[in-house]
Amino acid sequence: MANHKSALKRAKQNTIKQMRNRSYKTRLRNMVKKVNQAVEAQSVDEAKTILVETQSIIDKCASKGVIHKNTASRKISRLAKKVEALAG
């Protein structure tokens, strides 16, 4: 356990940020799953609309420091590639 006042504050901040990051990551994973399910179901329109929402969430996670910006770019690129392959 932290002994200094500043260490106590940092420990409290870390738990708050950990919960926030966990919710962002959960939301991100769920949206990626939705895109993949739409691609597997061969529904082009649904996949495209979900992809736009997912890109927004991925960019927000990257800007807030939840995931690295290169990771965000890679995820967006791979998802877009899947959807475009489906669209033909």
UniProtKB/Swiss-Prot annotation:
Location of region: Disordered:
1-23
User: Which keywords does UniProt give here?
Assistant: Ribonucleoprotein, Ribosomal protein, RNA-binding, rRNA-binding
Q: According to its record, what are the GO cellular component terms?
A: cytosol; small ribosomal subunit
Give the molecular function GO annotations.
small ribosomal subunit rRNA binding; structural constituent of ribosome
Q: Which InterPro entries match?
A: Ribosomal_bS20, Ribosomal_bS20_sf
Keyword DNA-binding found: no
Q: Where is the composition biased (Basic residues)?
A: 1-12
Q: Which GO terms describe its biological process?
A: translation
HAMAP family for this protein: Ribosomal_bS20
Hey, which family's this protein in? Belongs to the bacterial ribosomal protein bS20 family.
Summarizing the function annotation, the protein's role is: Binds directly to 16S ribosomal RNA.
Q: What is this protein called?
A: Small ribosomal subunit protein bS20
Q: Which organism is it from?
A: Desulfatibacillum aliphaticivorans
Q: Which gene encodes it?
A: rpsT
